[in-house]
Regions:
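Active-site bordering "gate/hinge" segments
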Residues: 1-90
Length: 90
């Protein structure tokens, strides 16, 4: 892995998000950010944070939208609950 990716991950975790031990962190990952996500996960582990990684892609979203035949929930409670219980969202 490029050392610059590790450095960027450290900046995100330490400076941008100011992650501390015990923080609950949601890391939203896309297909082009794999290396950065791995580096951020390592940084979070070093700091003793709790990680939940989510994955999204255009292909995944399209598959769901094409298959879904009903109305969408305008305010999905499960998403709100996740965010309310999260200390840091990256």
């Amino acid at each position: 892995m490029d050392e610059r990716v590790r450095e960027h991950a450290a900046v995100l975790v330490d400076w941008s998000a100011r992650v501390e031990a015990g923080d609950d962190v949601v890391l939203s990952v896309g297909p082009d950010a794999h290396d950065l996500a791995v580096a951020v996960a390592a940084e979070l582990g070093d700091r003793g944070a709790n990680l939940l990684a989510t994955y999204g892609s255009g292909e995944l979203t399209r598959a769901y939208l094409r298959a879904h035949d009903g109305d969408f929930d305008e305010d999905p409670a499960h998403e709100l609950a996740l965010l309310e219980e999260t200390d840091v969202y990256l």
